[in-house]
From Swiss-Prot:
PANTHER family: 3-DEOXY-D-MANNO-OCTULOSONIC-ACID TRANSFERASE/TRNA GUANINE-N 7 - -METHYLTRANSFERASE, PENTACOTRIPEPTIDE-REPEAT REGION OF PRORP DOMAIN-CONTAINING PROTEIN. Keywords: Methyltransferase, S-adenosyl-L-methionine, Transferase, tRNA processing. The gene is trmB. It catalyses: guanosine(46) in tRNA + S-adenosyl-L-methionine = N(7)-methylguanosine(46) in tRNA + S-adenosyl-L-homocysteine. This is tRNA (guanine-N(7)-)-methyltransferase. The lineage of its organism: Bacteria, Pseudomonadati, Campylobacterota, Epsilonproteobacteria, Campylobacterales. GO terms for cellular component: tRNA methyltransferase complex. Belongs to the class I-like SAM-binding methyltransferase superfamily. TrmB family. NCBIfam families: PRK14121.1, tRNA (guanosine(46)-N7)-methyltransferase TrmB. It is an enzyme of class 2 (transferase).
C-alpha cells in the first residue's frame, strides 16, 4: 500500500483542491484522522495515523480506489500541501499510472449489472490476466467478467487489455462469493477458478464451500460449467466432494493436461514437476429463483444532537452474532458535530466493511454494500443497536 511518513503536519483547512484532487472533510478519533478524498469520479479516505516520531499517511484499506494511481496522486498532493520534514515514502506517481477512467473497470455493483448482457464467462482471481485475456480473444462474442480482490491486478489487466485492443472484458474488485450472490440465476456460461490459494492447512479460508457451490449452480446456465485448475490434490479432492452433494452432477477429471495458455503460477509448478489437476463440473439440474433485492431503508432513523452525543459517549467495540450474520462496531470518529462509524457486518464467510455517516440521519459514506439478505439483516440490527446499546 503506498504511504509516507512525516514528522509534522500543518493545520488542515478543508475543503482543499488541486490538480483534480479534492480533500473535502476530516473525521478523527484519538489515534486516526480520515480525510474524505475525491479524485475524478472516485471517493476514498486518506488515513493519518500517529506513529513514533511522526505520522504515517496512507490510503484506508477498506475504501481504497480501484486505480492505484488515484491514491498515489492524492498522497502526492497531500504531502506537498500539508506535510513538513518527510521521513520516508513508499509511493511514486508514474507517468503511465492508470489515472483516467477506463471502461474495463467497474466501480460498483449497480454499474456492473447495467453492463451485463449476452453470454458471460467469469474468472475468479485472474491475477496477471493471461487466461482472462486469452479467453476474451478466443471468444469475442462473450463478455469475460474478472473478479479480483487486489486492486493492482485490475489496473494491470486493464492496461494490457487496452494495449492488446481487447474490448470484451469487465473487471471488478470484490470477493467472488459476494459477486455470485447478486447475479441473476442462469446468467453465466462458465466459471473459471484457476490456481486459487489452496489453504491446505486452513481449509475454512477457501473460496470453495457448500454455499459457493450452490451459488455456482444457481448462476450457471443449464449447460453451464465450472472449471477448477489447481496444483493442490487436497483442493481438487475437496472441491469434488462439495459438488458430489448435488443430485446428478457430471464431471470431467484430468491430470497434467497442457492448455493453450499457461499462467505464471502454472509455469512455476511445472518447473518444479508438480502435478496439475483439472475438474470440470456441469449438469447441476437445480431449480433456482432469483433473489429479490431489498433496500437498506436507513431513512427511518433520525438523530438529534443529544442522540449523537450519547452515541459518542457510550460507544463500545462490540460484536453481535446471529445465526446467519454478524455485526461488529469497530471504530467511531468525530466530524465537526457529526459522527462517522466504521462497522463490519454480513455473512460470516462474506464480511463487508463500511463507514456510516451520522448527522440528522444515517447514510453510507461511500457506495452501498451488496444487497444480500445477510447484509440487510445486519443493517436492520445496527439500527436497533444504536437505539438500545448506545442508549439514544
Amino acid at each position: 500500500m503506498p504511504n509516507f511518513k512525516s514528522k509534522k503536519i500543518k493545520e488542515i483547512n478543508l475543503p482543499y483542491s488541486k490538480d483534480d484532487v479534492e480533500f473535502l472533510w476530516l473525521a478523527k478519533n484519538d489515534n486516526v484522522s480520515l480525510i474524505y478524498t475525491k479524485v475524478q469520479e472516485e471517493s476514498f479516505f486518506l488515513q493519518i495515523k500517529k506513529a513514533q516520531n511522526g505520522f504515517v499517511i496512507k490510503g484506508d484499506k477498506h475504501t481504497k480506489p480501484s486505480k492505484i494511481g488515484y491514491l498515489q496522486k492524492a498522497l502526492k498532493i497531500f504531502k506537498e500541501g500539508f506535510c513538513e520534514d518527510i521521513i520516508n515514502e513508499a509511493f511514486g506517481l508514474k507517468n503511465n499510472a492508470l489515472i483516467e477512467k477506463t471502461p474495463f473497470i467497474v466501480d460498483n455493483f449497480d454499474e456492473l449489472l447495467s453492463r451485463l448482457q449476452g453470454k458471460i464467462y467469469i474468472e475468479i482471481g485472474f491475477g496477471s490476466g493471461r487466461h482472462l485475456l486469452y479467453q476474451a480473444k478466443e471468444n469475442p462474442n462473450v463478455l469475460i467478467l474478472g473478479v479480483e480482490i487486489y486492486n493492482p491486478a485490475l489496473t494491470q489487466v486493464a492496461k494490457l487489455a487496452k494495449a492488446q485492443n481487447v474490448n470484451n472484458i469487465l473487471l471488478i474488485q470484490s470477493d467472488a462469493r459476494l459477486l455470485l450472490s447478486v447475479l441473476k440465476s442462469k446468467s453465466v456460461e462458465k466459471i473459471f477458478l484457476h490456481f486459487p490459494v489452496p489453504w491446505d492447512k486452513k481449509p475454512h479460508r477457501r473460496v470453495i464451500g457448500k454455499d459457493f457451490c450452490k451459488e455456482c449452480a444457481r448462476v450457471l446456465t443449464q449447460n453451464g460449467r465450472f472449471e477448477l485448475r489447481t496444483d493442490s490434490f487436497e483442493y481438487f479432492n475437496f472441491t469434488l466432494e462439495q459438488f458430489l452433494t448435488f443430485p446428478v452432477p457430471k464431471f470431467s477429471l484430468r491430470k497434467n493436461e497442457n492448455l493453450e495458455i499457461s499462467s505464471k503460477y502454472e509455469d512455476r509448478w511445472k518447473k518444479q514437476e508438480k502435478n496439475i489437476y483439472d475438474l470440470w463440473v456441469w449438469n447441476f439440474n437445480q431449480e433456482c429463483k432469483n433473489y429479490e433485492l431489498n433496500e437498506f431503508n436507513l431513512s427511518s432513523v433520525e438523530f438529534s444532537k443529544e442522540d449523537l452525543k450519547k452515541i459518542e459517549q457510550n460507544f463500545k467495540n462490540i460484536t453481535i452474532k446471529k445465526d446467519d450474520f454478524f455485526l461488529h462496531f469497530e471504530s467511531i470518529y468525530k466530524q465537526d458535530e457529526n459522527l462517522l462509524l466504521k462497522v463490519a457486518f454480513g455473512a460470516f464467510n462474506k464480511p463487508e466493511h463500511c463507514y456510516l455517516h451520522l448527522d440528522k440521519t444515517i447514510d453510507f459514506a461511500f457506495k452501498e454494500p451488496f444487497k444480500i439478505q445477510e447484509n440487510i439483516k445486519a443493517i436492520n440490527e445496527l439500527k436497533e443497536i444504536l437505539k438500545v446499546q448506545f442508549k439514544i
